[in-house]
């Protein structure tokens, strides 16, 4: 049967389909109820329902967006190996359900701040493939003007505050954003994402304490992919139940490979944070690549373990099965969609390669508050003299 047509969303990564995919086969707007793969495990709160309201449009949108994220990260791997991406590069393949599920539960008024595994979060916030690949290759059209690279994506107009390279340091910044939201009486929350490797950082507990003390709308999200830079969680944490780490702060453990479980948990957490203050979400997820491109990812875990997760828990395959079981598309139509996605990614890479490098003067922008930078120092300032022609 023909593929249902996706409605346009505020998220610009949803592209119009070719004519073959634009045939509207149903005007049925009846909600689809989907059961989460696993029950939620709660700490100091009642868990949300496992029944999640969705629609045919959302299911198809989830599949396409997650497939796009996966293809983008695989392409980044190839570009890095071809030395077109320099410096650090941390890939997100395997964890796409967290990005897409979280985005489905919130609005662009809600803020997100994360660590260095940030490409897919940026895409979910409305960033474009062209911005992604331009930034990765240090080009002028990048989301951070080619200066940030893989670890420092940013999109202020969509309340995405990075992209941070210091382990755990984004969490107190996120709580600061939540403080501003409460101070300004905004009906919005902040999601501060961190990994299991950052969960033992002292600043995380300090930020959580002040957030609880002041009832800030802060949601701390531990993306537990079970390995730090090469250290299994059991070797670094006496208590790996990260959703309980707040002690006096409620928490929820979520199947982070199930986009609908993530959506339901984030929706629940947002309501809680607006009414009662901070909450911790632990997303039980998995990364397929190593910690970074310099890590093969197979010295501290077996290849059988990785392939086992791919076969049994892959987040995209889970959505694909739901699409097929609800007769929203055929196998062939989904494969054709994936071909379109590959072309879209290839076109974005080609466009980014043609983009010029930043001007040397760009080194001095976004360093100081506007009005207090090099433009106010005069021609004798040493920073200005150091600027390359």
Swiss-Prot record:
<dbReference type="GO" id="GO:0005829">
    <property type="term" value="C:cytosol"/>
</dbReference>
<feature type="binding site">
    <location>
        <position position="227"/>
    </location>
    <ligand>
        <name>Mg(2+)</name>
    </ligand>
</feature>
<feature type="binding site">
    <location>
        <position position="167"/>
    </location>
    <ligand>
        <name>pyruvate</name>
    </ligand>
</feature>
<dbReference type="GO" id="GO:0005634">
    <property type="term" value="C:nucleus"/>
</dbReference>
<dbReference type="GO" id="GO:0005739">
    <property type="term" value="C:mitochondrion"/>
</dbReference>
<feature type="binding site">
    <location>
        <position position="90"/>
    </location>
    <ligand>
        <name>pyruvate</name>
    </ligand>
</feature>
<dbReference type="InterPro" id="IPR029061">
    <property type="entry name" value="THDP-binding"/>
</dbReference>
<feature type="binding site">
    <location>
        <position position="225"/>
    </location>
    <ligand>
        <name>pyruvate</name>
    </ligand>
</feature>
<feature type="binding site">
    <location>
        <position position="225"/>
    </location>
    <ligand>
        <name>thiamine diphosphate</name>
    </ligand>
</feature>
<keyword id="KW-0786">Thiamine pyrophosphate</keyword>
<feature type="binding site">
    <location>
        <position position="165"/>
    </location>
    <ligand>
        <name>thiamine diphosphate</name>
    </ligand>
</feature>
<keyword id="KW-0460">Magnesium</keyword>
<dbReference type="InterPro" id="IPR017597">
    <property type="entry name" value="Pyrv_DH_E1_asu_subgrp-y"/>
</dbReference>
<dbReference type="Pfam" id="PF00676">
    <property type="entry name" value="E1_dh"/>
</dbReference>
<dbReference type="InterPro" id="IPR001017">
    <property type="entry name" value="DH_E1"/>
</dbReference>
<feature type="binding site">
    <location>
        <position position="167"/>
    </location>
    <ligand>
        <name>thiamine diphosphate</name>
    </ligand>
</feature>
<dbReference type="GO" id="GO:0004739">
    <property type="term" value="F:pyruvate dehydrogenase (acetyl-transferring) activity"/>
</dbReference>
<feature type="binding site">
    <location>
        <position position="196"/>
    </location>
    <ligand>
        <name>Mg(2+)</name>
    </ligand>
</feature>
<dbReference type="GO" id="GO:0046872">
    <property type="term" value="F:metal ion binding"/>
</dbReference>
<feature type="binding site">
    <location>
        <position position="225"/>
    </location>
    <ligand>
        <name>Mg(2+)</name>
    </ligand>
</feature>
<feature type="binding site">
    <location>
        <position position="117"/>
    </location>
    <ligand>
        <name>pyruvate</name>
    </ligand>
</feature>
<feature type="binding site">
    <location>
        <position position="116"/>
    </location>
    <ligand>
        <name>thiamine diphosphate</name>
    </ligand>
</feature>
<feature type="binding site">
    <location>
        <position position="116"/>
    </location>
    <ligand>
        <name>pyruvate</name>
    </ligand>
</feature>
<keyword id="KW-0670">Pyruvate</keyword>
<comment type="function">
    <text>The pyruvate dehydrogenase complex catalyzes the overall conversion of pyruvate to acetyl-CoA and CO(2). It contains multiple copies of three enzymatic components: pyruvate dehydrogenase (E1), dihydrolipoamide acetyltransferase (E2) and lipoamide dehydrogenase (E3).</text>
</comment>
<comment type="subunit">
    <text>Tetramer of 2 alpha and 2 beta subunits.</text>
</comment>
<feature type="binding site">
    <location>
        <position position="117"/>
    </location>
    <ligand>
        <name>thiamine diphosphate</name>
    </ligand>
</feature>
<feature type="binding site">
    <location>
        <position position="196"/>
    </location>
    <ligand>
        <name>thiamine diphosphate</name>
    </ligand>
</feature>
<keyword id="KW-0479">Metal-binding</keyword>
<dbReference type="GO" id="GO:0005759">
    <property type="term" value="C:mitochondrial matrix"/>
</dbReference>
<feature type="binding site">
    <location>
        <position position="197"/>
    </location>
    <ligand>
        <name>thiamine diphosphate</name>
    </ligand>
</feature>
<feature type="binding site">
    <location>
        <position position="291"/>
    </location>
    <ligand>
        <name>thiamine diphosphate</name>
    </ligand>
</feature>
<feature type="binding site">
    <location>
        <position position="198"/>
    </location>
    <ligand>
        <name>thiamine diphosphate</name>
    </ligand>
</feature>
<keyword id="KW-0560">Oxidoreductase</keyword>
<feature type="transit peptide" description="Mitochondrion">
    <location>
        <begin position="1"/>
        <end position="32"/>
    </location>
</feature>
<keyword id="KW-0809">Transit peptide</keyword>
<feature type="binding site">
    <location>
        <position position="196"/>
    </location>
    <ligand>
        <name>pyruvate</name>
    </ligand>
</feature>
<feature type="binding site">
    <location>
        <position position="227"/>
    </location>
    <ligand>
        <name>pyruvate</name>
    </ligand>
</feature>
<feature type="binding site">
    <location>
        <position position="198"/>
    </location>
    <ligand>
        <name>pyruvate</name>
    </ligand>
</feature>
<dbReference type="GO" id="GO:0046686">
    <property type="term" value="P:response to cadmium ion"/>
</dbReference>
<keyword id="KW-0496">Mitochondrion</keyword>
<feature type="binding site">
    <location>
        <position position="165"/>
    </location>
    <ligand>
        <name>pyruvate</name>
    </ligand>
</feature>
